[in-house]
Amino acid sequence: MKQLTILGSTGSVGTSTLAVVRENPDRFAIKALVAGRNVAVMAQQCIEFRPAYAAMADEGAARELRILLAENGIATEVMAGEQAACELAALDDVDQVTAAIVGAAGLLPTLAAIRAGKQVLLANKESLVTCGRLFMDAVQQSKTQLLPLDSEHNAIFQSLPESIQRQLGYSSLESHGVSRIVLTGSGGPFRTTPLEQFTAMTPDQACAHPNWSMGRKISVDSATMMNKGLEYIEARWLFNASAEQMEVILHPQSVIHSMVRYTDGSVLAQLGTPDMRTPIAHAMAYPQRVNSGVEALDFCRIGSLTFAEPERERYPCLYLAIEAFDAGQAATTALNAANEVAVAAFLQEQIRFTDIAAVNQKVVERLSLQEPSCIDAVLEIDRQAREVAVGLVKSLHN
């Protein structure tokens, strides 16, 4: 039986991971849960799964959780803070760590799991978008097995030879007969919206994703295709891919989650119902398979699968991300930080939908930054980029 620590247990990926555990109680047990400040959900999770440890982001939330668990007779030891999260990610008797804390808060706990040699199920985008080289070097040094949880990266992983799966980030695609990785994206809710209407698009319209159920921030990222841009950056690191070995295409049905082209003309693809439990179950049980609880794909109901090329004028954020990777880690870090500020401002109706790309581009252009050599340097770039982005948002809002 695998012992699990889940970093970010109350979020979308965390709750989906626990749903897979619920389907397979004879294969997985929860050793530790880590979350932010959602005490109510964490209490329910502790009552159901009885972890030995739980950690909250701060002492106030931890105190509330202790009271709730004591009232229910649950003996889980409750901790608080980033150091506690790092300790629970590196526990001796933990086999697998799900890294699903969103944002910079997930960097150090994820790195702690890698350095402890755990099998790491990676959902934290920032680990690779802002710290790709640092993280992949740590993976190689610790001989950790990294398993991607994003549906697209998991699809690519499943479509690659086992020899690459076992040496993620350091194998040569070319020497294994791989010619290109094809990253698919739905194109979001504005795929067919006339461009002249973009300035009038509202947060609610941007968050109405046609296929996936997601949080508001990532829904906006889907509408701008910044999410695909960030996934492109992650894929370059995860699969040691050059720009020439990457391809991004629109696939509105979200059934093919990504593909791999081989030199002999073959294309391997992973298909499935759009549900995060599928890639999570695959990674949790790898190299075996377990029940995820997901409904089987009905090909007759789908009818047809279509593809198109993403237009630059419709999806400028996608191309900003592609160009940022070639500019370096400082640029991808700055872009990610700027985008978080811009999307938050759009969701609060402080700027227009089209301003998101404008803010992102100006931040990357204005900052003159050195390549980061440690996480502190990454966090400083992140801070500077946010500062500039906030100033730009204010100038647009006034």
Swiss-Prot record:
Catalyzes the NADPH-dependent rearrangement and reduction of 1-deoxy-D-xylulose-5-phosphate (DXP) to 2-C-methyl-D-erythritol 4-phosphate (MEP). Keywords: Isoprene biosynthesis, Manganese, Metal-binding, NADP, Oxidoreductase. Mn(2+) binds at D150, E152, E231. NADPH binds at T10, G11, S12, V13, G36, R37, N38, N124, E126, G215. Its cofactor is Mg(2+); Mn(2+). The keyword Oxidoreductase applies. It comes from Serratia proteamaculans (strain 568). The gene is dxr. The keyword NADP applies. It catalyses: 2-C-methyl-D-erythritol 4-phosphate + NADP(+) = 1-deoxy-D-xylulose 5-phosphate + NADPH + H(+). Homodimer. Its EC number is 1.1.1.267. This is 1-deoxy-D-xylulose 5-phosphate reductoisomerase. GO terms for molecular function: 1-deoxy-D-xylulose-5-phosphate reductoisomerase activity; manganese ion binding; NADPH binding. HAMAP family: DXP_reductoisom. It comes from the Bacteria. Belongs to the DXR family. It is an enzyme of class 1 (oxidoreductase).
